[in-house]
């Protein structure tokens, strides 16, 4: 017996979207079809890519999705309602993030208005579906310390270390938790930066030693001056914390964990690179000699790469365009390893210093 076409499409879509914990939906039509396919209901996050609160919610929502991943009849989904304005219009989305529960019987959707932590969201979905779940502990990108290992980790003179001193009962700490977890994820590929935390209520000796008077307290321990940690007094948003660490550690991370477009760039070489493609071959030869001389004074990896690019362009002007296109394609692959992504992004940044409009 053949299934009606619509039923087949919905079935196929249903099987596809539940392949991962949180389903990223791409259109109003896909959203509605997927909701209809959810036999026990659907929780949808309407978000915007620029929204700081959405970024803070992301790790919590991913954990929620993982928790219900093995229940194919429940949908934990999300859609960019800023890009898909027809979605925002239909569901009257006026702020981000907005979480809405869609009952399986097609009755009136319910906007979620409770706390945005894993426990509260899990309880909400469990009440709506009848599926009882316990919170699962996902691998963390933030190192949890105690009295025994605090000095070994924090006082490592090869690493800049950001420490959150927290207490379990502290409401502000709970609100900071998803942001701090994301912060750990952003910097997990930085070999000289560590994002850590310690329960200074339980390990009160550490709290007293470091003059922790309230929770959460965040301190930065620089690798070159461990005896003078700096109290972080800025905004506790993800963007502000990233900006702070980038400034203190010389890192160049963006909120999604990728490198900024300035990573790897060297101003001295950029000055030559900006005009190199338009120069005559004779002028290029002169510049290349200057670059080689500078490279003798600085043998760092990216200095060598600049030199290589100058040499490649001298032999083939089209090489820089082809190589930039190749690296861009590699960076779009979702399965790319973090270390490879950093390497490709830095190379692409340097190549862009040669290309018109990217200086």
UniProtKB/Swiss-Prot annotation:
A Pfam family reported for this protein in Swiss-Prot or TrEMBL? Thioredoxin
Asked if the record carries the keyword Repeat, the reply is yes
InterPro entries documented for this protein: ERp29_C (IPR011679), ERp29_C_sf (IPR036356), PDI (IPR051063), PDI_thioredoxin-like_dom (IPR005788), Thioredoxin-like_sf (IPR036249), Thioredoxin_CS (IPR017937), Thioredoxin_domain (IPR013766)
Task: Say if the entry is tagged with keyword Disulfide bond.
Answer: yes
Instruction: Tell me the keywords, alphabetical order.
Output: Disulfide bond, Isomerase, Redox-active center, Repeat, Signal
What catalytic activity does the UniProt entry give for this protein? Catalyzes the rearrangement of -S-S- bonds in proteins
Query: For site (Contributes to redox potential value), what residue positions does UniProt give?
Result: 52-53
What residues correspond to the site Lowers pKa of C-terminal Cys of first active site?
116
Family, according to the entry, reads as follows: Belongs to the protein disulfide isomerase family.
Q: What is this protein called?
A: Protein disulfide-isomerase C17H9.14c
Residue numbers annotated as active site? 51 (nucleophile), 54 (nucleophile)
Cystines in this chain: 51-54, 170-173
Swiss-Prot/TrEMBL GO biological process terms:
cellular response to oxidative stress; protein folding; protein folding in endoplasmic reticulum
Signal sequence range: 1-19
Q: Which organism is it from?
A: Schizosaccharomyces pombe (strain 972 / ATCC 24843) (Fission yeast)
